[in-house]
Each structure stands twice: as C-alpha cells, then as structure tokens.
Amino acid sequence: MKIAIFDSGIGGLSLLNEALKRFRGVEFIYFADNKNAPYGTKSKDEIIRLCLNCVQFLTNLSVDMIVIACNTATSAAITELRSSFSVPIIGMEPAVKLGVNAGGDILVVATPATISGNKLSDLIHKVNLESKTHLLALPKLVEFAQNMEFDSLEVLKYLKDEISKFDLSNISLLVLGCTHFNYFKDSFRAILPNKTGIIDGVNGTINQMIRRLGGVSEFGDKNSIRYISSTENLNVKKIEPYLKRLDIMREIN
C-alpha cells in the first residue's frame, strides 16, 4: 500500500505523524511544495494550478491514495483534483462539525484563502453554526512554521494581538484550520482560557482514509517514508525536529 501525503510545506507532517501511529505496512510518500509555499495568500486559480501539478507528479509514482494534508489546497482545488485524476483523493477541512455540541462560540483560525473560500462557509452552514462561529486569518503563522520559529516572543505577540480581537470568555472551542498551526498548540493554550478546547482535522482525515480503504489500516509489518520537496530532497534529519515537536503538541487539547 502506497499513500502520498501532500502539503504546501511542513504543515502536513502533523497528519503523517499521526498516520505513522495508526497505519502499519504502508509506504508513505510525503511531498512538500516548499518552492511555492505558502499557499494561503495565493489566488484560487494559482492554488489549483499548483495542486494539479503536484498531484500529477504523485500519480506518476503509482500511489494508491493521495491525501491533501492542507486545508487551503482542499478548499481551493479538491473538486478539480478529483475530476482530473482517478486515484482516490482525500481532502482535509477544519473540524467545525465537532463544534455542534460546544457550549459557547467557536473560533476558526486558518489561512486567508481558507477563510475566504466557499468550502468553509458551506461547511459552517451545513452544520448550522453561522451564529456562533468566528473566523480569523493568521497568514504569518505559516511563515513562522516554515522557518521553524515556534517559541519566539514575536510569535506569542502576534497570536495575542490577533486573538485578543475576540471576547475569549465566550469562546469554548478553537478550531485549527491549517495543519501548520498544529505546531503552535502550546502558544494557543497559553493564551486561551482553560475551558476553551483546541481541535484540528487530523484524526478526522485519518478516519476518512481508513474508511476509504475498507476499514483496513494494517498492510504489513513496518511503515516506510520517502520525503520529497519541490526545492530539494528532504532527509530524515531535517524532518525529525518537526516530528518531535508534533509529538508534544498532539497531547495538547
């Protein structure tokens, strides 16, 4: 079983990190389009063009499934991708539906492209949460992640300044609508009230992958990983610091 995971950069490693724990015997290919990151500030047409090129590259590797581990790419291009390729393509979207039972309001943080896209507004409408959902674009956070700047005072100030625009006493759930944002769960946790939960779309996406594979998640004894970047070949030593941080962040909710 060969599964490709695609993101504009290192955000999708949060999905790969969890997939390595949930699957066995899978040959994973992680493709990062670092050359064109970030996607979140680009036009929809540009994102579609980039995604079509990347998915074409991955289909040439004879993969059995492609996972778009990028909310921005899913929002802008998933329809075009599925109509252009026969390989199963799993998208990723903000876990807004988990806010149905939230006692207070919901704050969704994502890239500008995801926030302004029809897919998110349609999703919020579908679960009837328009009246209690607030949206906040955090474009700088993707750049911080790509530069491995996770714990600086500049990051914390940026998040405090942006999130303080809302009455946090009313927010019962923060939805991370960008996989890059998973690297900053500790900073979000430090800013938000203890009662405010933090969720992302990783587990929901992996559950969808397993459903698409007929409920099967074990295909052999060991997983393998091949890292590919549009700028250079990635090696494990470059990836390990990200995965170690994600192991810590996954415990924060």
Curated annotation (Swiss-Prot):
Its EC number is 5.1.1.3. It is an enzyme of class 5 (isomerase). Substrate binds at residues 7-8, 39-40, 71-72, 179-180. One of its GO terms (biological process) is peptidoglycan biosynthetic process. GO terms for molecular function: glutamate racemase activity. The keyword Cell wall biogenesis/degradation applies. The active site is at residues 70, 178. The keyword Isomerase applies. Keywords: Cell shape, Cell wall biogenesis/degradation, Isomerase, Peptidoglycan synthesis. Pathway: Cell wall biogenesis; peptidoglycan biosynthesis. InterPro entries: Asp/Glu/hydantoin_racemase, Asp/Glu_race, Asp/Glu_racemase_AS_1, Glu_race. It catalyses: L-glutamate = D-glutamate. Signal peptide: none annotated. Disulfide bonds: none annotated. Provides the (R)-glutamate required for cell wall biosynthesis. Belongs to the aspartate/glutamate racemases family. This is Glutamate racemase. It comes from Campylobacter fetus subsp. fetus (strain 82-40).
